[in-house]
Structures are given as C-alpha cells and as structure tokens.
C-alpha cells in the first residue's frame, strides 16, 4: 500500500512539473505552432471571430483586435503589441479601444485608409510617434529585415453583396515572417486576385454569408493559390466542417479552430 501511495505521489509530481513547463513556454492549448526557414517559432492564438495573436521572435502581432464582440476580450492579458493590423472599418474588426489597450510608443499600427481616418483626434497619442501607417491595396511595407507585409484586395463580388465590402476600400494582408507566408484575407469573397498569391503557407479565409464566403467559395478560393494550411475563420454559425470534404485530396490541410 505504501509503495502504491508513493507511486501516486510521484505521478502527481510529474504531472505538475509538465504543467509548469507548458505554462512557462507561453503556448496555450489554443495555440498552433509553426517553424520558419531559420528555425524560429511562429505561434497563433485564436482569440475569436477575426481576432488573432501571432507571436514571432519575441514579438506580438495582433490581427483585428476587438474587445466588446462576444465573448468580450480582456486585452490587458496579452500585454502591449509590437504590431497591430486592421483590415477594415466594421465593428467586428476595428475597435479603437482595443487598439489603445494594446498600444504604446513602440507599437506599429497598420490599417486601411478608412480606418486610419476614423482613429480621430482622441487617438492622437498613436500618431505623435508616427507609428500609424495606412496601406492601400497593392502596397508593400518592410517592418524589419525579416518581416514584410503586402496589402491585398478584399471585397465582395456577388451582385447583392457588393455594398458590404466595396472593391478598393478594405485590405487583406500577406505577412512574411522569416519566409513563412501568412495570408489574412479579411472580409472577402473568392476574388480573382487570389490566383496571384504565391508561396502561401498559412491562409485565414472567412466563411459566413451574406458578408463573405460560403464553404464552397472558400474551397474554391483555397484551390486558387493552394496554401499548405487553411483556417476557416469569421464563420459564425456556418457549418465549416464540410470544408474538409470540399478540400479532400487537394493537398491542402484544413484546420478548424474556435473562430466563430
């Protein structure tokens, strides 16, 4: 009995040690981790809907941070961001308070021109450091020797949806982190410009009607540029599980995470 008791205690201590190591690594159970060409880790934290955190080389990169959209997010637990990217002006993507909570004088905020205009004088503290950059479709920016971003089109093409995301207003982004290419599509349908994307490792594609894509459109979009991994996101109640079947035998891995 004593031997059994000791064995139980040792097992518990081992589990506690493992849990401590996981916590100290900074990666939660909600993170997916990839490796760049030089062996650096890139991790993704799936916050909700269209909001992500990407961690790379000690940097925090926030995508479309939004506080109030349910479930409400406490961005203070993430610390200050090094980079914030905003795709467009809609409430589930653009949140001035979230940007303020995540920003300090070192934070670089990149958004489309409409959102830059909407920041307004209340957020002048961001502009005084010259750390707010408005990008338009087709523009590129070098953020560091090993980090660059391209602003790419994101818009609706179905006739009765074009008012939601008109062509030329909103951005998608292609982030290059030490050669790992990540496509954040923003709110878009399967537009022809997607066929021009190249070397995409990871793609986040939206999937909800009437604002973005159906599962069938998403599958068609993915086949246009063949990323290694596709994450459906921004999907609300859309049955995204069917994307697995739609992309079966395509060579594209589908990963579904909690991004309603």
For the regions a language model picked out, list residue spans one by one.
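Zn-dependent metallo-beta-lactamase
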Residues: 2, 6-57, 249-250
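Pre-active-site segment of Zn-dependent metallo-hydrolases
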Residues: 30-37, 47, 51-89, 93-100, ...
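Active-site HxH/HxHxD metal-binding segment of metal-dependent hydrolases
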Residues: 72-140
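Binuclear metal-ion centers of metallo-dependent hydrolases, dominated by the metallo-beta-lactamase
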Residues: 123-147, 219, 223-260
């Amino acid at each position: 009995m004593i031997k059994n008791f000791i064995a139980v205690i040792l097992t518990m201590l081992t589990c506690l040690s493992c849990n401590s190591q996981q916590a100290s690594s900074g990666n939660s159970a909600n993170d997916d981790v990839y490796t760049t060409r030089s062996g650096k880790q890139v991790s993704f934290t799936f916050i909700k809907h269209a909001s992500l955190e990407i961690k790379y080389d000690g940097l925090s990169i926030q995508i479309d941070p939004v506080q109030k959209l349910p479930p409400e997010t406490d961005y203070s637990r993430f610390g200050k961001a090094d980079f914030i990217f905003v795709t467009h002006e809609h409430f589930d993507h653009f949140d001035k308070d979230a940007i303020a909570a995540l920003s300090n004088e070192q934070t670089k905020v990149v958004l489309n021109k409409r959102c830059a205009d909407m920041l307004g004088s209340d957020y002048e503290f961001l502009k005084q450091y010259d750390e707010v950059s408005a990008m338009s479709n087709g523009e590129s920016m070098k953020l560091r020797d090993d980090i660059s971003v391209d602003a790419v089109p994101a818009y609706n093409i179905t006739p009765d949806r074009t008012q939601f995301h008109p062509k030329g207003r909103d951005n998608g982004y292609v982030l290059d982190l030490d050669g790992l290419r990540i496509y954040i599509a923003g709110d878009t349908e399967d537009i022809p410009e997607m066929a021009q994307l190249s070397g995409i490792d990871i793609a986040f594609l939206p999937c909800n009607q009437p604002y973005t894509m159906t599962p069938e459109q998403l599958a068609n979009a993915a086949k246009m540029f063949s990323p290694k991994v596709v994450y459906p996101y921004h999907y609300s109640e859309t049955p995204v599980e069917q994307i697995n079947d739609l992309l079966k035998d395509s060579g594209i891995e589908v990963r579904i995470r909690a991004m309603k």
